[in-house]
Amino acid sequence: MKLSVLLALGASSLAAAAPAATACDCGAAVTDRLLFSSSISTFQAARNALNPPCCDWSSDNCSSSPDKPRGYDFIPSCQRHDYGYRNGKRLNRFTEDYRKKVDDNFKADLYNYCSQFSGLESWKGVECRRYADIYYFFVRECGDGDCP
């Protein structure tokens, strides 16, 4: 009897000493930091780690558009754009102003990607930005689900 009481007390004290589970934070501040303030590589690292796990990390990459038009890898930019839309909706923040901000960030991400082409490859940067402009146009026209 004494042994079972000691074991029960020991087990309960171990449970009390264990850290309490913390609530996952994927609120507006975290979402905005990953979306608007972090580099695309920092965003991708968080996405690959699914950190924080309560964010909606799902993505269909560049939807029905090619993920890599003419070899330009737009996937990370498309994934961050999806993150903005999905988590904006999840947090009930998805207004037209918010959508425009996410879309503008998408264009900036694409242009930043295109800026890697310089010197003898500067023509690729020009071509890449033209594709970026097309992708931006379509998210503005069709991103709300109302495509002509």
Curated annotation (Swiss-Prot):
Coiled-coil positions: none
Q: Which domain of life is it from?
A: Eukaryota
In which residues is Ca(2+) bound? Answer: 82
Q: Per the record's keyword annotation, is Repeat included, yes or no?
A: no
Localization, UniProt: Secreted
In the UniProt record, the signal sequence range is 1-23
Q: Does the keyword Hydrolase apply?
A: yes
| Residues at the catalytic site | 81
User: Where on this protein are sugars attached?
Assistant: 61
List keywords of the entry alphabetically. Calcium, Disulfide bond, Glycoprotein, Hydrolase, Lipid degradation, Lipid metabolism, Metal-binding, Secreted, Signal, Virulence
GO MF term (any one):
metal ion binding
An example Gene Ontology CC term for this record: extracellular region
Q: What is its EC number?
A: 3.1.1.4
Disulphide bonds in the chain: 62-78
Q: Where are the transmembrane segments?
A: none
The Gene Ontology biological process annotation of the record reads:
arachidonate secretion; lipid catabolic process; phospholipid metabolic process
Substrates-to-products reaction catalysed = a 1,2-diacyl-sn-glycero-3-phosphocholine + H2O = a 1-acyl-sn-glycero-3-phosphocholine + a fatty acid + H(+)
Cofactor comment text? Binds 1 Ca(2+) ion per subunit.
| Cofactor needs | Ca(2+)
What is this protein for, i.e. what is its function?
A: Secretory phospholipase that catalyzes the calcium-dependent hydrolysis of the 2-acyl groups in 3-sn-phosphoglycerides. Increases the ability to utilize host-derived nutrients and lipids, and promotes lipid dropplets accumulation. Plays a role in virulence.
Question: What family does the entry list?
Answer: Belongs to the phospholipase A2 family.
Name of protein? Secretory phospholipase A2
